[in-house]
Amino acid sequence: MPSKGPLQSVQVFGRKKTATAVAHCKRGNGLIKVNGRPLEMIEPRTLQYKLLEPVLLLGKERFAGVDIRVRVKGGGHVAQIYAIRQSISKALVAYYQKYVDEASKKEIKDILIQYDRTLLVADPRRCESKKFGGPGARARYQKSYR
């Protein structure tokens, strides 16, 4: 198999709560797969548009020259969806920065951040740990005076 020059690829991760999605972005023809399945096959169906937001915002032509493969682990269904969309967005920005030009990368970044900051910046909120003296992080056990 003849090689077509050096392999142009970037590896980026997206996170939400405990879900982590790792995206490999390389030169290709517009393929986006998550755990080996196309974006349209990902459940839950109600959050399908959340996954497609980066593609719809930036247009298919920006994704036409790249293949993105995402592996996602941990968390629940919703957290995984948010991790996937973040990793796809970050992968495209990183690819454009490394292999295309700085101006188009800045344009992409500005569009994404103006729409929704969590597409590029991780949400730092985490679950607060349980403390003694109560059933949860803040709730206390009921107390009686007699």
UniProtKB/Swiss-Prot annotation:
Q: Which residues carry this modification: Phosphoserine?
A: 3
* Classification via InterPro entries: Ribosomal_Su5_D2-typ_SF (IPR020568), Ribosomal_uS9 (IPR000754), Ribosomal_uS9_CS (IPR020574), Ribsml_uS5_D2-typ_fold_subgr (IPR014721)
Q: Where in the cell is it found?
A: Cytoplasm; Nucleus, Nucleolus
Output one GO BP term.
rRNA processing
Q: Which residues carry this modification: N6-acetyllysine?
A: 60
Q: Which UniProt keywords apply?
A: Acetylation, Cytoplasm, Nucleus, Phosphoprotein, Ribonucleoprotein, Ribosomal protein
The main location class comes to: cytoplasm
GO cellular component annotations, sorted alphabetically? cytoplasm; cytosol; cytosolic ribosome; cytosolic small ribosomal subunit; extracellular exosome; focal adhesion; membrane; nucleolus
One GO MF term on file is: RNA binding
Short name of any one Pfam family annotated for the protein: Ribosomal_S9
- State if Ribonucleoprotein is listed as a keyword: yes
Looking at the UniProt entry, the stretches that span the membrane are none
Describe its assembly: Component of the small ribosomal subunit. Part of the small subunit (SSU) processome, composed of more than 70 proteins and the RNA chaperone small nucleolar RNA (snoRNA) U3.
Q: Which family does it belong to?
A: Belongs to the universal ribosomal protein uS9 family.
Task: Write out the function statement from the record.
Answer: Component of the small ribosomal subunit. The ribosome is a large ribonucleoprotein complex responsible for the synthesis of proteins in the cell. Part of the small subunit (SSU) processome, first precursor of the small eukaryotic ribosomal subunit. During the assembly of the SSU processome in the nucleolus, many ribosome biogenesis factors, an RNA chaperone and ribosomal proteins associate with the nascent pre-rRNA and work in concert to generate RNA folding, modifications, rearrangements and cleavage as well as targeted degradation of pre-ribosomal RNA by the RNA exosome.
What PANTHER family does this protein's entry cite? Answer: RIBOSOMAL PROTEIN S16, RIBOSOMAL PROTEIN S9
**Name listed for the protein in its UniProt record:** Small ribosomal subunit protein uS9
Task: Give the gene that encodes this protein.
Answer: RPS16
